[in-house]
Each structure stands twice: as C-alpha cells, then as structure tokens.
Regions:
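Catalytic histidine neighborhood in serine/cysteine hydrolases
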Residues: 194-213
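Conserved alpha/beta-hydrolase catalytic His-Asp/Glu region
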Residues: 95-98, 113-172
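Conserved HGGG/HGGXW glycine-rich cap/lid loop of the alpha/beta-hydrolase fold
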Residues: 1-50, 64
Length: 233
C-alpha cells in the first residue's frame, strides 16, 4: 500500500460528487478521498478559501473543468499545501466577453424556469459525439444538475465569469502536475490543456481517445489509471 497524500477532488460546472464516482473506488485504495463542495460561494477566491478550510493540512488536488479553475486559485492561495496537482479538461484563461455573455443568458433562463433546457444544451457540448444519445450519461448530467440546483448553478456561473487569468501563475507551480483531457472536448478544447502543460514545468499531458469533456464517466478506466499513476508518482 502506498503512502499517497489525501486526495481532494473538485467537480466542475453542474457537477456533484457523482462525476467522480466511476474513479473513486480505484483512487480510494491509495488513500483518503474527499470531494469538495463548490456550490456555496460565488467567487473563485471564496470557494478556494472554503475548500482549504475543510481540506487536510497537505493534500493532492484534482480539479475538473470549473474545478480546475478552483484548483488554480488554491495554488495561488496556498501552494505549500498542495503536494500534487491534476488539471482535468480545464484551462488557465479567463472568460472571454462572448463566453460571459452566454453565461448571463444561461442565468436568465435558469431564473425563468428553463434550467433543464440549459442543462440539455450543456450536455450536448460535454460528451463525445458518439455518446450524444447515451441515456446513462444524459441521466447522470441531469441528476447532478438537480443536486447542484438553480441557486448553486448561478453561483457557479458567477464565479466562472469573474475568474482571473491563471496563465501568468503557471510557472510558479512546482509540484508534480498531470494535465488530462479528451481528444474531442467541445467545451474546453484540448489545445488549452496543452497550453497549460507547456506552461507548467515538469508537467505531463494525457489525452484520452474517444473522450469529450467528462472523462470520468466517458473513459473511467483510462481516467482512473492516469490518476493512480499521478498519485503514485
């Protein structure tokens, strides 16, 4: 049994702990696993502070999508507490004006009762084209969205829109870092994952085949294997 650091997993937009369910059994064998709550605050700084207040003194940190934005904020606030970092289907860039405009429209629609319609549209960009008609994946995304709720969703979008540009801070990351993405991510193009990997000294990039924005349920075995290798060092 390895002496792996405790692991803190941070989900993404409209994602609950369920997003990590396909990989937790494998990761749990290596050490304690905690899934962070990221729906109680509406800024990256506040979300990161809350996670740090609840996390072990020193830990491995993995963030998926929005969770990657949060992970990069944690690296700004307390880099000495993070022994390993995994950035999954995420990016270091801030929101573009066009992306923020789309998010404001989503907030309006969710407030007006079209939350499920918004979730359906997000799902279409989340999964690999071959999985668009996968009822299991669609149900998973809708179940998670229900758990996050409209208020949590609005908080998440508010935090995402105001996130800082993390590209200038990538060179300060010194811990072993995995950058993982899918070959067909239509939400955050894998070119942006490659950009992060290029900016973090000593990091390594894993691109999963036949995978969109949700590698944990889309390619669970490959995702778990990559994360286990990262944890074991």
């Amino acid at each position: 049994m390895t002496d792996a650091l405790p692991l803190v997993l941070v989900p993404g937009l409209i994602s609950s702990p369920r997003i990590y369910a396909p990989v937790i059994p494998a990761l749990w064998r290596l050490g304690p696993v905690m899934v962070a709550n990221h729906v109680r605050d509406d800024s990256m700084a506040a979300i990161a502070r809350r996670i740090l207040s609840e996390a072990p003194p020193r830990f491995a940190l993995a963030g998926h999508s929005m969770g990657g934005y949060i992970a990069l904020e944690i690296m700004r606030q307390a880099p000495e507490r993070v022994g390993r970092l995994a950035l999954i289907n995420t990016q270091a860039r801030p929101d573009t004006p066009e992306a923020s405009a789309r998010r404001r429209t989503m907030i309006t629609r969710a407030k007006e009762g079209d939350y499920h319609g918004v979730v359906d549209e997000l799902f279409a960009g989340f999964v690999h084209p071959s999985r668009q008609d996968d009822p299991r994946l669609r149900q998973l995304v809708h179940d998670m969205a229900e758990e996050v709720g409209v208020i949590g969703f609005i908080r998440q979008l508010t935090a995402i829109m105001s996130r800082p540009d993390s590209r200038p801070t990538l060179t300060a990351i010194r811990c072993p870092t995995l950058v993982l993405t899918g070959d067909t991510d239509n939400t955050i193009p894998n070119s942006l994952s490659k950009e992060m990997a290029d900016g973090i000294d000593g990091s390594w990039l894993v691109v999963l085949e036949n995978c969109g924005h949700l590698p944990q349920p889309e390619q669970p075995e490959e995702t778990a294997q990559a994360l286990m290798e990262w944890l074991r060092g």
